[in-house]
């Protein structure tokens, strides 16, 4: 977090709670580190604030936190995670108010540097948009593109904006 009025960086306290927002097979310990990438914050249908974080370490996961301000300090309560299937490599996330989410799958995890360069130069399709709901991932039809990266969901209009950074 950063307070833009003071340019102060705020390192929140993280407490591990029961996994109620993720996949029950996904586990996290207090001692586990995070490898954060794309993030999104929404006010859920139940009025709580949910932060979704793509994490590349120690495993490929999507981490879910509740944000609360207590005694003038921000606290993150870990509320669950979702294991990312081995065939997917996520970049960004956009949450829905019901706790489900969309994520961009940029390219195969095992892509070689040569294949990545060729894909980038030719702007070939390398990934697509994925939706997670009811503890299951599904590919969003017609979302293939070259290097899908950042996304923003406008849920009330049922529109998602996708940045294909290689074309």
What are these regions (language model features)?
Residues 4, 65-74:
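Short loop/turn segments immediately following beta-strands, especially the blade-tip
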Residues 53-55, 103-124:
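Short, conserved, GDST-rich strand-edge loop motifs in beta-rich repeat architectures
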Residues 50-53, 100-102, 159-162:
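Conserved beta-propeller blade signature
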Residues 42-48, 95-98, 155-157:
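Residue-level detector of Asp-centered blade-edge/turn motifs that repeat once per structural unit
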Residues 35, 58, 89, 125, ...:
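Beta-rich catalytic cores
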Residues 12-16, 28-31, 81-86, 140-145:
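Surface loop/turn motifs at the tips and blade-to-blade linkers of beta-strand repeat domains
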Residues 1-45:
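Blade-loop segments of beta-propeller domains
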